[in-house]
């Protein structure tokens, strides 16, 4: 939702302040295929295996999202 940095519906998430829906200090992310322990996964790490003719999708190192079609900057 607007203004939220993370999903405050899960108070057990150590990356997200459930009261404010903001990332905790030092956290880069709270969830996503390219987020691990509140930090972005390094650039080039496979986050989704190839299917058919499509290449593996890889983390960018700058986002918690896993981009489509293997583009990682």
UniProtKB/Swiss-Prot annotation:
Region (Disordered): 51-73
GO molecular function: toxin activity
GO cellular component term, pick one: extracellular region
Tissue spec: Expressed by the venom gland.
This protein's record includes keyword Zinc-finger: no
Matching SMART domains: DISIN (SM00050)
Cellular compartment(s): Secreted
Domain Disintegrin: 1-73
Positions occupied by motif Cell attachment site: 51-53
Gene3D superfamilies reported in the protein's UniProt record: Disintegrin domain
Assembly information from the UniProt record: Monomer (disintegrin).
Function comment: Inhibits fibrinogen interaction with platelets. Acts by binding to alpha-IIb/beta-3 (ITGA2B/ITGB3) on the platelet surface and inhibits aggregation induced by ADP, thrombin, platelet-activating factor and collagen.
Misc. remarks from the entry: The disintegrin belongs to the medium disintegrin subfamily.
Name of the protein: Disintegrin lachesin
Native source species: Lachesis muta muta
């Amino acid at each position: 939702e607007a203004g939220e940095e993370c999903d405050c519906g899960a108070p057990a998430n150590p990356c997200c302040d459930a009261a404010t829906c903001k990332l905790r200090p030092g956290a880069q992310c709270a969830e996503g295929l390219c987020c691990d322990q509140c930090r972005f996964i390094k650039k080039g790490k496979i986050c989704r295996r190839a299917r058919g003719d499509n290449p593996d999708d890889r983390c960018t190192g700058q986002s918690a999202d896993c981009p489509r079609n293997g583009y990682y900057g």
